[in-house]
């Protein structure tokens, strides 16, 4: 291999790495959007259940149905955490809790909201 071939391979490798980095960033942004939407829908669903007075989960009885799993009731503190996250603060466990996110999304914080 001469220098030109090595240089061309390095250039192609750099282009591939840049493309992978771009695609990874896009996937991360999409995952964050989906988790945020899921959390918002869960909170909205919980609030609607409270308004309707339907706190008990609905189950469908069938001959082959398994016993329903216990559904966690959402804690009112989760709403407060969602508000804090919306204002730009970390709510994830550990050293970052309470620190400003500087406009960046945090998958750990979103995991706390989705639990």
From Swiss-Prot:
It is found in: Cytoplasm, Nucleoid. Pfam families: YabA (PF06156). Its cofactor is Zn(2+). Keywords: Cytoplasm, DNA replication, DNA replication inhibitor, Metal-binding, Zinc. Zn(2+) binds at residues 90, 92, 106, 109. Binds 1 zinc ion per subunit. The keyword Iron-sulfur does not apply. It comes from the Bacteria. One of its GO terms (cellular component) is nucleoid. One of its GO terms (biological process) is DNA replication. NCBIfam families: PRK13169.1-2. Homotetramer. Interacts with both DnaA and DnaN, acting as a bridge between these two proteins. Belongs to the YabA family. Involved in control of chromosome replication initiation. Inhibits the cooperative binding of DnaA to the oriC region, thus negatively regulating initiation of chromosome replication. Inhibits the ability of DnaA-ATP to form a helix on DNA; does not disassemble preformed DnaA-DNA helices. Decreases the residence time of DnaA on the chromosome at its binding sites (oriC, replication forks and promoter-binding sites). Tethers DnaA to the replication machinery via the DNA polymerase beta sliding clamp subunit (dnaN). This is Replication initiation control protein YabA. It comes from Staphylococcus aureus (strain JH9). The gene is yabA.
């Amino acid at each position: 291999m001469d220098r030109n071939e090595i240089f061309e391979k390095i250039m192609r490798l750099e282009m591939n790495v840049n493309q992978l980095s771009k695609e990874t960033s896009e996937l991360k942004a999409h995952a964050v959007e989906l988790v945020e939407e899921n959390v918002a829908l869960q909170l909205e669903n919980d609030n609607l259940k409270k308004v309707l007075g339907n706190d008990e989960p609905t189950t469908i009885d069938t001959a082959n149905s398994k016993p329903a799993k216990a559904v966690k009731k959402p804690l009112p503190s989760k709403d407060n955490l969602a508000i804090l996250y919306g204002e730009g603060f970390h709510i994830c466990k550990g050293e970052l809790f309470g620190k400003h996110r500087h406009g960046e999304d945090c998958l750990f914080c979103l995991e706390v909201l989705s639990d």
